From Swiss-Prot:
Keyword Transit peptide: no
Entry superkingdom: Viruses
This protein's name: Long-tail fiber protein gp37
Disulfide bonds: none
Region of interest called Disordered, as start-end residue ranges on this chain: 905-927
């Protein structure tokens, strides 16, 4: 056959070596035997790789009938179709996985492991996983686990189980609209977050029943019991034709015994009895009323033997403490015990008045249309804090008792309209109208005390009169005529000289009076004087004493007084009286002092005399109480201490002034008090602050309080607003010396009416100011709680600002930081860190720290400073840092051990083995070769002597001819050795075993706790809620 010529490659055995461009011609090949890589040189002089070891491009189909193993990534630009499964020991990654047959499978590694479908973040951390847990013989379970945020180590899991026909379990189930199911089994239903107007549950059935009077118009709402075998209670709603709609409660295994019900018109029915306010224990069995005392139909209140007890049709009793107090029948109220009507707040231990204008007992007597008051009869009526009784009606009240009627205390008042007359047991009769007797007054008693007596009058002049009324018929007096007696000896002030006065008068004035004067001088009995109002016609007048004419007196001739005129009782002169020729024109005097009317050229004076010179003494040397300017009309009092200038309407006071008690100074319209303060006029009190408490440093309006009251308010300025029924005042509280601006509205809650307001703005001596209500400056309000509102920034609402700051200030820990707490009792505003969720809307600041809404579970955890590359709040399981242990056993040379000696004797082999040997063959014909020979002029440099003589120069060299190919044949055989046997002498001998130095495997046993710990003290971790 033809022989292929060997292909020559440039070769290299060093890994990674590429041929240089200078060693290859275009198209020439080179190979790296280590990398199994082929190279060539292209027409541009570049070295390129051939083959797949370093990549390349295949334009066409490739069929691999075997295993394709990739040690790097596999990138598929187009689609990929496989006829069998795709397996990976690590993972398969792609943007989208789509099943065109509708299935994805996750196979567990064994029957005790989970099958997973994972969801990850971009960094490979877990978002969630769906996994199926190992099945049991009776059920299976698929769980959905969701990681609670990137910064959390906690998870939420949801369970789908095959038991009970299929179950779903989650911590919370939220339905944005409705959760529709036939049955829900829960421990507690919470409706705390429901919107206003929503119901906890609906059972608005739309049953339709045929016919009328149907028996199935029933909606069964609930049935409950407390224990196995306990009473079952049923809650039912019924709506049956011809009957009222009703909600009712029954008992029994089925609704057999109706307990009570409420109809749609509000009426309620109870099967047996009702007890109100009788609870004494948590689960009372004996607080439902005393059946023995109350019967079997009752309403008890407070205790079990007090309330209403049904007796028979139309009759029930009021029962107190087990005893019948009253019976109510269809036609009456019958008291079966002592009846007491009164008002008491402690069951009769003490009694109080009924409310104002209210009665203890009222009888509706207005049915006869009487017009007395409200027409009702009232017993125990509170009128002005006093107990009154009113009997009213258009009939009469009859009192028929054998011994008459006693009124005690003895006061009887008869009233008709606004008129009344009162009879008193002491004989007094008081009447609004005069007492009129239709017949005469006949005094039957015979002693000398019998007669008409008039009590002493209570007022001056005009009391205790005897009056004859006037008439219009013939013979009657025209005007009434009165006789009265009085006196003024006991008057407090004024004239007290008339001990008794007897006077006769009519409606136009007095006729005459006579009186006894009080004794004077050495008199022991006063003299009698009489006075007539008109003319006195007498044949003669004899007067032992003075004769005085009060009115005018007509005398036929002149009256000449030779020694002046002395008028003791006064004189009335209708004409002008002229007094001239003397400075002291007129004197008014008494035994001690006189007052002289004196004039000068320009003034008129009223000047007193010295003491005890009243009748004839000269004027006082210095006193000038009254001066009247004759040229200007000015009036000066007290040496012009007080001057009235009529022309200028000006009053000048040149001295201290005083208005005595109970008198006032009133300023009229547009009047005012002007305290002058100019550069030339320095008002009272002007000066330093330090001098203001000096008693001699006054003010234009000054009050010096020098009182020892324990407690009193002294106002210095007051303004009362009549229409507003309120008063403002400025003053001092004596008990503490504080100054107050005060407002009082209404009365004193007594005689002046109810109080409507009472506020005081108080200036404290220590500099504090007290306001009863809020302080307002512009739009800013300082309220009584200390809050400031209405301002800007933090002062829009200071409380809100402080509350916000207080949460941060109260603790040195930021909100969200774990705080070690040495107690199982958690302080208010904090929570244990147990992995629980929290309401982020209720605690927005905590939500900033934990945006997932889950507080980390710090039980058994320690806090570690976050290393680089680790997420905040990520959890790390416990573990031991990777380390190694060394262990060795000491080397021991156990020496050489000798086995026991035993003689095995001689052993023979079997007698087989005869055989021969044969062979044949030939050698190859190869062997043709040539030799190269050089000739020299001396000894050959190759060391081979070619000639026996010396060759002194190189003659040259050439090859011998190529010849010598030949072959050999051969064959051989051996004779048969025949069958034969051998014997072997073993003999007695021993064996030695060299143990030598050696090592042993060391097992290190486990020891220590279940987890890595350091010395520690257990604290609870708590976190602030905000």
């Amino acid at each position: 056959m033809a022989t292929l010529k060997q292909i020559q490659f440039k070769r290299s055995k060093i890994a990674g070596t590429r041929p240089a461009a200078s060693v290859l011609a275009e198209g020439e090949l080179a190979i790296n035997l280590k990398d199994r890589t082929i190279f060539t040189k292209d027409d541009s002089g570049n070295i390129i790789d051939l083959g797949f070891a370093k990549g390349g491009q295949v334009d066409g189909n490739v069929t691999i009938n075997g295993l394709l193993r990739l040690n790097g990534d596999y990138v598929q630009t187009g689609g990929m179709t496989v006829n069998g499964p795709i397996g990976s020991t690590d993972g398969v990654t792609g943007k989208i996985f789509r099943s065109t047959q509708g299935s994805f499978y996750a196979r567990a590694t064994n029957d005790t492991s989970n099958a997973h479908l994972w969801f990850e973040n971009a960094d490979g951390t877990e978002r969630g996983v769906i996994y199926a847990r190992p099945q049991t013989t009776t059920d299976g379970e698929i769980r959905l686990r969701v990681r609670q945020g990137t910064g959390s180590t906690a998870n939420s899991e949801f369970y789908f189980r095959s038991i009970n026909g299929g179950e779903f379990q989650a911590n919370r189930i939220l339905a944005s609209d409705s959760l529709v199911t036939k049955r829900i089994a829960v421990d507690t239903v919470i409706h705390d977050a429901k919107a206003f107007g929503q119901y906890d549950s609906h059972s608005l059935v739309n049953y339709v029943y045929p016919g009328t009077g149907e028996t199935n118009g029933v909606n069964y709402l609930r049935k409950v019991r407390a224990k196995s075998g306990g009473t079952i209670y049923h809650e039912i709603v019924t709506a049956q034709t011809g009957l009222a709609d009703e909600v009712s409660w029954w008992s029994g295994d089925t609704p057999v015994f109706k307990l009570y019900g409420i109809r749609d018109d509000g009426r309620m029915i109870i099967r047996n009895s009702l007890a109100l306010g009788t609870f004494t224990t948590n689960f009372p069995s004996s607080d439902y009323g005393n059946v023995g005392v109350m019967g079997d139909k009752y309403l008890v209140l407070g205790d079990t033997v007090t309330g209403l007890s049904y007796k028979k049709t139309g009759v029930f009793d009021l029962v107190g403490g087990g005893y019948s107090v009253a019976s109510i029948t269809p036609d009456s109220f019958r008291s079966t015990r002592k009846g007491i009507f009164g008002r008491s707040e402690d069951q009769g231990a003490t009694w109080i008045m009924p409310g104002t204008n209210a009665a203890l007992l009222s009888v509706q007597t207005q049915a006869d249309n009487n017009n007395a008051g409200d027409g009702q009869t009232h017993i125990g009526y509170n009128a002005g804090g006093k107990m009154n009784h009113y009997f009213r009606g258009t009939g009469q009240m009859n009192i028929n008792t054998q011994q008459g009627m006693e009124i005690n205390p003895g006061i009887l008042k008869l009233v008709t309209g606004s008129n009344n007359v009162q009879f008193y047991a002491d004989g007094t009769i008081s009447s609004i109208q005069p007492i009129k007797l239709d017949n005469e007054i006949f005094l039957t008693k015979s002693n000398n005390t019998a007669g008409l007596k008039f009590g002493a009058p209570s007022q001056v002049d005009g009391t205790r009169t005897i009056q004859w009324n006037g008439g219009t018929r013939e013979g009657q007096n025209k005007n009434y005529v009165i006789i009265k007696a009085w006196g003024n000896s006991f008057n407090a002030t004024g004239d007290r000289s008339r001990e008794t006065v007897f006077q006769v008068s009519d409606s136009q004035g007095y006729y005459f009076y006579a009186h006894r004067k009080a004794p004077t001088g050495d008199e022991t009995i006063g003299r009698i004087e009489a006075q007539f109002a008109g003319d006195v016609y007498a044949k003669g007048i004899i007067a032992n004493g003075n004769f005085r004419v009060v009115g005018s007196s007509a005398l036929a001739g002149n009256v000449t007084m030779s020694n002046g005129l002395f008028v003791q009782g006064g004189s009335s002169i209708t004409g002008q009286v002229k007094i001239g020729g003397t400075a002291n024109a007129l004197r008014i005097w008494n035994a001690e002092y006189g007052a002289i009317f004196r004039r000068s050229e320009s003034n008129f004076y009223i000047i007193p005399t010295n003491q005890n010179e009243g009748e004839s003494g000269d004027i006082h040397s210095s006193l000038r109480p009254v001066r009247i300017g004759l040229n200007d009309g000015m009036v000066g009092l007290g040496r012009d201490s007080f001057i009235v200038d009529q022309n200028n309407a000006l009053t000048t006071i040149n001295s201290n002034s005083r208005i005595n008690a109970n008198f006032r100074m009133q300023l009229g319209q547009s009047a005012y008090i002007d305290a002058e303060c100019t550069d030339a006029v320095r008002p009272a009190g002007a000066g330093s602050f330090a001098s203001q408490n000096n008693e001699d440093v006054r003010a234009p309006f000054y009050m010096n309080i020098d009182r020892t009251d324990a407690s009193a308010y002294v106002p210095i300025l007051k303004q009362r607003y009549v229409q507003g029924n309120g008063c403002y005042s400025l003053g001092t509280l004596i008990n503490n010396g504080n100054f107050r601006v005060h407002y009082h509205g209404g009365g004193d809650n007594g005689s002046t009416g109810p109080q409507t307001a009472d506020f005081g703005w108080e200036f404290i001596k220590n500099g504090d100011f007290i306001s009863p209500r809020d302080l307002i400056a512009g739009k800013v309000r300082f309220d009584r709680t200390g809050n400031i509102t209405g301002g800007s920034g933090n002062f829009a609402n200071l409380n809100s600002t402080i509350e916000s700051l207080k949460t941060d200030i109260m603790s040195s820990y930021p909100i969200g930081a774990p705080i070690p707490w040495p107690s199982d009792s958690v302080p208010a505003g904090f929570a244990l860190m147990e992995g629980q969720t929290f309401d982020k809307s209720a605690y927005p600041k905590l939500a900033v720290a934990y945006p997932s809404g889950v507080i980390p579970d710090m039980r058994g955890q320690t806090i570690k400073g976050k290393p680089s590359g680790r997420a905040v709040l990520s959890a790390e399981a416990d573990g031991v840092k990777a380390h190694s242990h060394s262990a060795s056993a000491s080397s021991t040379d156990l020496g050489t051990k000798t086995t026991s000696s035993f003689d095995y004797g001689t052993k023979g082999t079997n007698s087989t083995g005869g055989h021969t040997h044969s062979g044949s063959g030939s050698t190859s014909t190869n062997g043709e070769h040539s030799h190269y020979i050089e000739a020299w002029n001396g000894t050959g440099v190759g060391g081979n002597k070619m000639s026996s003589y010396a060759i002194s120069y190189r003659a040259g060299g050439s090859n011998t001819n190529a010849a010598g190919n030949h072959s050999h044949t051969f064959s051989f055989g051996t004779s048969s050795a025949g069958d034969h046997s051998h014997s072997v002498g073993i003999g007695a001998h021993t064996h030695t075993v060299a143990i030598g130095s050696h090592g042993h495997t060391i097992t290190v046993n486990s020891t220590g706790n279940t987890e890595n710990t350091v010395k520690n003290i257990a604290f609870n971790y708590i976190v602030r809620l905000a």
